[in-house]
């Protein structure tokens, strides 16, 4: 595939509330890039850094963790701190493996934040377009 017709694949780990926004986006037929794949998770703080790296090694060009933030029904406000710590470890792991940190993003998305989710996906998609295909071993 040439870089001119590059269409990045984005994996979204969507926590409980953020997944509701994704579901609402589908129900309202909100437009966003169709090159996204969702994995529903109970809480963003459960995502291990090695799973982020694994997604890249399996061919994804970008990963978005859509967190419920302090709306998390499982951890409440503690979700933000734990997710942030895991994200920092993921950034370190990506750097050690030669993967640009711009390919990984964490965002707090509430259950009714369809537009915020769409914008996060669009922004990541544009970043990935400018970076081009991922180069992993």
Q: Where are the regions that the model predicts?
A:
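Iron-sulfur-associated redox domains of electron-transfer enzymes in respiratory
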Residues: 1-137
């Amino acid at each position: 595939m040439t870089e001119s017709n590059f269409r990045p694949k984005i994996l979204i780990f969507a926590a409980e509330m953020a997944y509701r926004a994704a579901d609402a986006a589908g129900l309202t037929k909100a437009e966003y890039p169709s090159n996204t794949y969702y994995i529903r998770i109970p809480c963003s703080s459960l995502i291990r850094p090695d799973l982020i790296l694994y997604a890249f090694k399996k061919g994804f060009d970008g990963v978005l963790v859509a967190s419920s933030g302090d709306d998390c029904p499982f951890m409440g406000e503690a979700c933000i701190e734990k997710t942030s710590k895991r994200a920092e470890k993921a950034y370190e792991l990506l750097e050690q493996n030669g993967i640009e940190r711009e390919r990984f993003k964490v965002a707090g998305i509430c259950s009714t934040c369809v537009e915020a989710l769409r914008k996060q996906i669009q922004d990541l998609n544009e970043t990935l377009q400018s970076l081009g295909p991922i180069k992993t071993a």
